[in-house]
Amino acid sequence: MITLLFYSGECMEISNTYQCTTEVMKSKFIAILFPIDDPDLFKKELAKIQKEHSKARHVVYAYRIDNKTKSCDDREPKGTAGRPLLELLLKKDLNKVALVVVRYFGGTLLGAGRLLRTYVQSGVNVLKEASIE
């Protein structure tokens, strides 16, 4: 697969959608990284993902569109999901990009620390899939 990255000012943008699955203690985390340039379009894409994964326990996300950033923990403990994903996007200087992680609960509580590490690892894994390391 050819990965297309290009610079917009000082930030990188992506042109494709990437997906990667991580499993921890029977919970499945599906990370989806995709280009987005409008918050309203993001809402539509998020709704599609939520519908496709309607049996998932959580759908957390972060996005950056120019100077606008947003993140959501979707009922996970505060600060364990959305914000760390946003920090990944900012650290990699990515712009016009969204990172959504869908969690299917595996029956075992992970605890805040392991939960945070797993969401971050899911984000790192999909960034590697997109050749952004």
Label each region the model flagged:
Residues 101, 109-133:
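Glycine- and Gly-Pro-enriched alpha-helical subdomains that act as flexible
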Residues 2-80:
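C-terminal regulatory domains involved in ligand/effector binding and gene-expression control
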Residues 73-78, 82, 86-88, 115-119:
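Conserved mixed alpha/beta catalytic, RNA-binding, or beta-rich assembly cores of soluble enzyme
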